[in-house]
Each structure stands twice: as structure tokens, then as C-alpha cells.
């Protein structure tokens, strides 16, 4: 494990007064004196409690978890290693060692798998199902199985974080980081961690429907540069299938009932042509991406 003075504990917060002091104390008890809390404008005394517990507190200049994490790492953290966690008391401080160990073994990014030891009541059934679907979608689209891409418990080198292209301002930051790891070949591993229910009186800032939709859109949007065959091919397939369905309907109506549907026939042909073009565009984009990755690999080998 890196020495504690080489690690910054990063905790983005928004109205976590019920838990933040205990979270900071737990990590300081583990030997981590460098604790940074970046706060999104809490109104419940979170900042004051964090300062009293020994953390360095800054107020983020924007809004949203993603913006807070980017600002913290880029502007306020100088330590070579970062352990990022939520301030809601759901993660185990004693897991810090196994989260950080891989960073001295050649890995640049570590994801804490909440499903490895999830305590009763830690996640609702809806959230559990949604997480599973998102993880499977990520593995299918981006070709990597990180098991829990939405985990807020992350350890990473500051250098690898700065190499990522991150734009999400909200809860999509974890998804973006996972996609960037897959896209850029950042050495990533997953370690089992314990995940607890939020303490009584602590309210979540996550909306499962709204934020789940945002995460799905982020997965699809990021496929454009990581899996263009899926990005263009999925729409192309849907368009082609719709066009073929309409064409079969037109043919049936004309052959069986002697009824012609000229407008629907034109729409069906347009759908088929548009879909085939997108499919071909996806194939060509995938070929170009493969050649680009091969060239980048050769350049890295020469360096």
C-alpha cells in the first residue's frame, strides 16, 4: 500500500451532517491525515462538522458530484494517490488498505465491489436491479466487466485521472471513469468491499429513475468513441427492422387485400436505406477505431 502521506482521501459532500464527522474520523484513525472534503453548498452544517473532524474543506465552484471530483483532483489535490468515497457512511474505512494495495502493484484504478459484501438494507430492490442491468449493459457495450461501475469507492493515481476526458457534472462521473478506463486501457482491477445501509436520518441525494436514465444515456453516448459499431449499429438495426416490418405489412396488404399503401411503402424504404447506411457507417467507424488503437499501441511501444 502507498504510504498514508502519499494518499488523499477525497469526499464530495452535500448535506451529509449526519455522517461526515464519523467518516472523517474513521479514515484518520486508519492513518490518513490528508482528508479533503469538497462541498456542494450544504445547508446543514456539513462543512463545519468536517473541519472540526480534521478535514480540509473547500466549496466547489460549480454543482454536481462530477464537477466536484474533477475540481478537487485537478485544483486541490497534489498527492499521487487518491481514495475517493461518499460521505454517507456506507463504506468501510478498514477496506482502504485493500483498495490502495493494487496501486503499488501496477494498477492505476481500483473499483470497490459493493455487491461482494452488501449488508441487508444497503440497497433497495429497484436500485439493485438497476445496478445489475447497468453493469451488464456496460460489459456488453464497452467489453469490460468491472462488476460494479457505479461504486463510489474508488482508488486511483492522480496521473491516470488527469489522462481521462471527463465531462459529467452529476452522478454519471463513476460511469464516465469506468468508460475511460476501458477506452484508454487504464489498468483497472476490482476488489471486494463492504457496503452498509445509510444511517438513520441520512437522506440520499440520488434519484434512481432520473439518475439511472442519465447513466444509461452516458453509456450510450460514450459508445460513440469506444464501440461505434454498437453506437451506430443499434440505431441502424432498429431503423432497418422497422422498415422491413412496414414493407412486409405493405406487401401483405397489396397481395392479400389488393390495398396499396404508397406513403408507407416510401417510409419503409427510407427506413431500410437509412438503417443500412448507419450499419455500414458503424462497421467503417469500428475499422478506423481498430486501426487507431493499433497505431497508438505501436507508438507507446516505441516510447
UniProtKB/Swiss-Prot annotation:
One function term, GO molecular function aspect: glycosyltransferase activity
Function: Involved in the assembly of a N-linked pentasaccharide that decorates the S-layer glycoprotein and flagellins. Adds the first hexose subunit of the pentasaccharide to the dolichol phosphate carrier.
Transmembrane intervals: 230-250, 263-283
BP GO annotations: S-layer organization
NCBIfam families xrefs: glyco_TIGR04182
The species this protein was found in: Haloferax volcanii (strain ATCC 29605 / DSM 3757 / JCM 8879 / NBRC 14742 / NCIMB 2012 / VKM B-1768 / DS2) (Halobacterium volcanii)
Entry protein name: Glycosyltransferase AglJ
GO cellular component: plasma membrane
Swiss-Prot/TrEMBL keywords: Cell membrane, Glycosyltransferase, Membrane, Transferase, Transmembrane, Transmembrane helix
Name of the gene this protein is made from: aglJ
Principal location class: membrane
Group of enzyme by EC: transferase
Amino acid at each position: 500500500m502507498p504510504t498514508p502521506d502519499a494518499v488523499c482521501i477525497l469526499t464530495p459532500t452535500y448535506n451529509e451532517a449526519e455522517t461526515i464527522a464519523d467518516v472523517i474520523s474513521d479514515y484518520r484513525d486508519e492513518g490518513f491525515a490528508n482528508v479533503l472534503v469538497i462541498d456542494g453548498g450544504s445547508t446543514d452544517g456539513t462543512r463545519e462538522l468536517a473541519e472540526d473532524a480534521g478535514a480540509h474543506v473547500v466549496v466547489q465552484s460549480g454543482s454536481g458530484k462530477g464537477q466536484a471530483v474533477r475540481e478537487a483532483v485537478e485544483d486541490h489535490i497534489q498527492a499521487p494517490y487518491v481514495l475517493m468515497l461518499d460521505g454517507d457512511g456506507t463504506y468501510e474505512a478498514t477496506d482502504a488498505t485493500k483498495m490502495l494495495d493494487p496501486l503499488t502493484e501496477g494498477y492505476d484504478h481500483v473499483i470497490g465491489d459493493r455487491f461482494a459484501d452488501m449488508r441487508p438494507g444497503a440497497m433497495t430492490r429497484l436500485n439493485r436491479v438497476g445496478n445489475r442491468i447497468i453493469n451488464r449493459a456496460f460489459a456488453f457495450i464497452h467489453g469490460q466487466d468491472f462488476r460494479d461501475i457505479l461504486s463510489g469507492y474508488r482508488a486511483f493515481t492522480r496521473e491516470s485521472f488527469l489522462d481521462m476526458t471527463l465531462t459529467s457534472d452529476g452522478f454519471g462521473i463513476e460511469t464516465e471513469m469506468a468508460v475511460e478506463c476501458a477506452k484508454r486501457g487504464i489498468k483497472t482491477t476490482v476488489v471486494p468491499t463492504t457496503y452498509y445501509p445509510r444511517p438513520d436520518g441520512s437522506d440520499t441525494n440520488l434519484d434512481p429513475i432520473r439518475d439511472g436514465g442519465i447513466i444509461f444515456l452516458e453509456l450510450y453516448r460514450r459508445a460513440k468513441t469506444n464501440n461505434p459499431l454498437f453506437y451506430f449499429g443499434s440505431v441502424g438495426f432498429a431503423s432497418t427492422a422497422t422498415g422491413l416490418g412496414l414493407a412486409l405489412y405493405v406487401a401483405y396488404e397489396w397481395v392479400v387485400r389488393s390495398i396499396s399503401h404508397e406513403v408507407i411503402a416510401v417510409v419503409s424504404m427510407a427506413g431500410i436505406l437509412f438503417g443500412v447506411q448507419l450499419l455500414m457507417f458503424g462497421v467503417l467507424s469500428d475499422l478506423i477505431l481498430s486501426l487507431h488503437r493499433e497505431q497508438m499501441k505501436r507508438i507507446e511501444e516505441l516510447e
